[in-house]
Amino acid sequence: MKNIRNFCIIAHIDHGKSTLADRLLDFTGAVTEREKQEQLLDSMDLERERGITIKSHAIQMDYVHEGEEFVLNLIDTPGHVDFSYEVSRSIAACEGALLVVDAAQSIQAQTISNLYLALENDLEIIPVLNKVDLPSANPEEVTDDIVDLLGCDPSEVIPASAKTGLGIKEILDAIINRVPAPSGKVDAPLRALIFDSVYNPFRGVETYFRVINGSIKKGEKIKFVATGKTYDADEVGTLRLKQFPRKEIKTGDVGYLITGIKDAREVKVGDTITSAVNPTTEAVAGFEDVKPMVFAGIYPVDTEDYEDLRSSMEKLQLNDASLVFLPESSAALGFGFRCGFLGMLHLEIIQERLEREFDMTVITTVPNVSYHAYTNKNPDDVILVNNPSDLPEPSSLNRVEEPFIKATIITKADYVGNVMGLCIEKRGEITNQTYLTTERVELTFDMPLAEIVFDFYDRLKTVSRGYASFDYTPIGLRESKLVKVDVLLNANIVDALSALLHVDNAYDIGKKMCEKLKELIPRQQFDIPIQAAIGAKIIARETVKALRKDVTAKCYGGDISRKRKLLEKQKKGKKRMRQVGNVEIPQEAFMAVLKLND
């Protein structure tokens, strides 16, 4: 046990976690020449293309240091704020962390939020300055930033380049010398932390775990604490590039477990595995059910594909237990699902995976967050509003509460004004402003989650020329004045375009929606009024003008009554058409509502 080291790599997006992991694997010989490829641990095509890590991965390496053999378990973590719970569980499975900072970009918001997670779990932090070979790198200044943040000695910061392989040996030596060995009781009852699960179509769910006390043997009966279900450990082993079956996994080590579970929802990340015969009394602390933050409707473009969409969603859920969905129907779009996601990136990824892996073309409605509504009749009973149509009638509504977050934004000092302007426009309240260095400022805001869902991230990058980085944590619900804005086409409500908005923004957004739809809806043979309404009150209107034939073209001479007769006849026809006419909404219209400011 004293020769095991468990560590993870934490960094902001794009600071080079996955490439550094590749180099560590090369250096320790965990990968043969034939298996090498860029971002080896990112197994999804999507992860490779976008250059992000979506799932956590784990891999074991052997390394000989001063004649002794050591086993290193690397747990790779996602960098994106949507997956912060997954990161926190991976961190809890380690004793040390490599804090990777890009020498050109310095410390960013997620570097700090993941660092706090690591410090809360008492991890030994090894700072690594990555990308020092870049022409734009600024190693001295960034080293000072790291020293300020961690309070460490400048000599402890390891300069490295994952691209060229510089500093890799120093990193491995630092892991062995500075990261403590696992401390656990070998003879205590089994207690292991689940930090990830992967669905394998042939063998069911593979559970990745780290043993804290005791050991887990092949064939023994085990129990998951949160769900209370018992299983047989059909196979246990360690994770090399391929799985490596073993008879038992001992205290302090990381491994995988196959029990033949077919439903990923039974394996909860952060849960505790214990023996069914001799269970542990205390579970590993910090487990929580992952709650979706953002909701959107997903509908098949062709209503007949509903069943295919259902089976695709179920297959995705096997691999991604944080996805939740319920059937719902809409008058405009037919049958579909109301889905819950961890954040906007998660929503995009699911949509892309549906298109890629299952060839489904889907329509996504306006994403919104989950509100709590209270009626006058029962002011204490919470009504969960995940869909604008669930909001009670305005007359019976007592109050609505919406989720707030604490947003941390790190930006260059030159852009503070722009960033503040954007956050205040998004109903944020500034709570703190700290200068990290003379150049870089950390701003914290309390703001509604709903404002971030739309286009906040893109606009933040725009106003700061790409320099600002952003991170958030939920801080609970607050009361807020919200109204439901409906969009009417030809006097019919289009339920898929309804949105819950704050009173102050309702008029502006309603007007913008109407203008945007006017551009996108093709002209028909009759006038189409597009209206935005709060309840029965119309707040904005645009009209898509009719296409009309010039009926008077065949009249020579000037008899006005003849012309008038033809025009009146045309007018009657158009009126009749409008009563029976049906307006098709193009797919772009639904997406365009999300990008109102372009």
Curated annotation (Swiss-Prot):
What's one GO BP annotation on this UniProt entry? positive regulation of translation
Q: Which Gene Ontology terms cover its molecular function? A: GTP binding; GTPase activity; ribosome binding; translation elongation factor activity
Where is it located?
A: Cell inner membrane
Disulfide linkages recorded for this protein, renumbered to the chain, are none
Q: Is the keyword Ribosomal protein in the record? A: no
**Can you supply one Gene Ontology CC term for this chain's record?**
plasma membrane
* InterPro entries for the chain: EF-4, EFG_III/V, EFG_V-like, EFTu-like_2, LepA_C_sf, LepA_CTD, LepA_IV, P-loop_NTPase
Q: Which residues form the signal peptide?
A: none
Q: What does this protein do?
A: Required for accurate and efficient protein synthesis under certain stress conditions. May act as a fidelity factor of the translation reaction, by catalyzing a one-codon backward translocation of tRNAs on improperly translocated ribosomes. Back-translocation proceeds from a post-translocation (POST) complex to a pre-translocation (PRE) complex, thus giving elongation factor G a second chance to translocate the tRNAs correctly. Binds to ribosomes in a GTP-dependent manner.
What's this protein's family per the entry? Belongs to the TRAFAC class translation factor GTPase superfamily. Classic translation factor GTPase family. LepA subfamily.
Kindly provide the name given to this protein in its UniProt entry: Elongation factor 4
Native species: Christiangramia forsetii (strain DSM 17595 / CGMCC 1.15422 / KT0803) (Gramella forsetii)
| Annotated gene | lepA
